[in-house]
């Protein structure tokens, strides 16, 4: 039986309550989260649609790691499952596997409605997910907002689900008084803040090309969100996607709180092997690499030319331009209780060396002298070393990684469909409308990193 250190067992979003002062002790923080509940409602027509099924299952998989008091689903759920990679034979089976409970009524609970038309106003928190073309977002459940149609793009399911769960957590945790009362969304085809994400401008393409080879660096919070997103894409033959999966860590109880594909059966197992098993069950082809990614790693002929980076350390990122990749998309997330909803996405090459993009030493919030950590030390729960290790762990939430993964994978899809890629996407889920985008000036028109047709 594997024994885990306290720093490996702490729920990464419960840590937000400790670091922010919302809870004075770990017990108080855990009780607070056990009081968080969320309900999902899906209509009979929506329950049979692949995009709405993907939205619901993505949302349940995230919410079950956040709303520890229960995730409840109302709707006609005994329908055939039509989402690749999801567990079970029916929608109800998949919901149960992902941590949801089948419920006759969502009344009295904070509610997320999956797609469909505007609904009558409800008491309390209620938002509706929106997917149209390459655009995804949320609106108040009763809002008359209806987007113009466009060619379906499955990653909008993950995007809208993540935005909805983020909004619900903002509401229950008191993160912003506007939670649930605003329209929030973006376009994965043109993510600039100036884009009207509710309107299709004619530029969105039919999804035609998918990557055939990818190298995933890091298989934690971000890496598993990448895999979930890849699992939603419509591969005619899933075996046509070849993945190199690189990581050195094992799945810990902390992993379960942020990483969308991890479950208790994986505890103590290498992330590479657990994720390879999931990917192969989805039908993908995998190769695993269980060594640190650093400046000594070199891509060999025949290995994926495109890298997707989800590493949480600057030293690994500094080596991204030395490994021989022809194209890299990298995402980094905030670590502290104030900035954990922030993300910054880079594409490489972009005319700058990685040494000019990141510092080897990254600043962290000093929280180990907070009341919750002082209580642990005073009560003898942990010694000074244990408190320091625990306080140094990042705050994290699965909905943050899911939004970042939607944007990261979309950069690859945009490249394959001939669009200019973005050098930088800077976004905070507290205020999505204030995101900033910088276009990549490099010419990728002659790059062929490998693709297959939908």
Regions found by a protein language model. Name each.
Residues 50-54, 260-269:
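Glycine- and acidic-residue-enriched helix-capping/strand-helix junction motifs
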Residues 290-298:
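Conserved SAM/SAH-binding loop
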Residues 78, 250-252:
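Helix N-cap at the beta1-alpha1 junction of Rossmann-like dinucleotide-binding domains, i.e.
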Residues 86-97, 263-282:
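N-terminal glycine-rich dinucleotide-binding loop that anchors FAD/FMN and/or NAD(P) in oxidoreductases
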Residues 1-240, 299-454:
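Glycine-rich phosphate/adenylate-binding loop
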Residues 141, 254-260:
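Short acidic, glycine/proline-rich loop/turn micro-motifs
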Residues 243-244:
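Conserved beta-strand positions in the Rossmann-like core of class I SAM-dependent methyltransferases
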Residues 282-291:
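A conserved beta-strand->alpha-helix junction
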């Amino acid at each position: 039986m594997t024994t885990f250190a306290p720093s490996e067992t702490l729920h990464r979003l419960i840590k937000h309550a400790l670091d922010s002062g919302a809870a004075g002790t770990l017990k108080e923080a855990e009780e607070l989260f056990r009081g968080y509940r969320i309900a999902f409602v899906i209509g009979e027509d929506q329950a049979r649609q692949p995009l709405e099924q993907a939205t619901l299952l993505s949302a349940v998989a995230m919410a079950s790691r956040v709303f520890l008091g229960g995730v409840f689903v109302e709707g006609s759920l005994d329908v055939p499952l039509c989402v690749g990679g999801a567990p079970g034979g029916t929608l109800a089976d998949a919901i149960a596997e992902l941590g949801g409970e089948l419920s006759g009524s969502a009344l009295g609970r904070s509610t997320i409605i999956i797609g469909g038309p505007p609904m009558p106003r409800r008491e309390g928190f209620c938002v509706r997910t929106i997917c149209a073309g390459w655009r995804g977002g949320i609106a108040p459940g009763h809002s008359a907002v209806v987007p113009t149609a466009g060619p379906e793009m499955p990653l909008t399911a993950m995007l809208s689900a993540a935005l909805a769960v983020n909004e619900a957590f903002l509401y229950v945790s008191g993160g912003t008084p506007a939670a649930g009362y605003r329209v929030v969304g973006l376009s994965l085809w043109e993510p600039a803040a100036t884009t009207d994400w509710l309107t299709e401008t004619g530029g969105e393409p039919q999804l035609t090309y998918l990557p055939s080879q990818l190298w995933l660096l890091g298989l934690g919070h971000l890496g598993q969100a990448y895999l979930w997103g890849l699992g939603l894409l419509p591969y005619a033959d899933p075996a046509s996607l070849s993945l190199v999966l690189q990581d050195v860590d094992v799945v810990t109880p902390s992993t379960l709180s942020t990483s969308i594909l991890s479950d208790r059966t994986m505890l103590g197992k290498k992330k590479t092997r657990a994720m390879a098993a999931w990917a192969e069950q989805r039908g993908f082809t995998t190769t695993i690499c269980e060594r640190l990614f650093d400046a000594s790693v070199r891509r060999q002929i025949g290995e994926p030319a495109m890298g997707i980076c989800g590493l949480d350390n600057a030293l690994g990122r500094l080596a991204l331009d030395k490994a021989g990749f022809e194209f890299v998309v990298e995402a980094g997330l905030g670590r502290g209780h104030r900035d954990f909803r922030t993300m910054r996405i880079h594409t490489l090459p972009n005319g700058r060396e990685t040494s000019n993009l990141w510092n080897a030493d990254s600043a962290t919030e000093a929280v180990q002298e907070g009341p919750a950590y002082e209580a642990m030390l005073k009560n003898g729960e942990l010694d000074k070393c244990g408190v320091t290790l625990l306080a140094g762990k990042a705050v994290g939430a699965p909905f943050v990684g899911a939004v970042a993964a939607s944007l990261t994978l979309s950069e690859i899809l945009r490249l394959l469909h001939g669009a200019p890629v973005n050098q930088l996407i800077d976004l905070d889920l507290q205020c999505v409308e204030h995101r900033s985008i910088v276009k990549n000036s490099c010419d990728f028109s002659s790059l062929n990193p490998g693709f297959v047709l939908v």
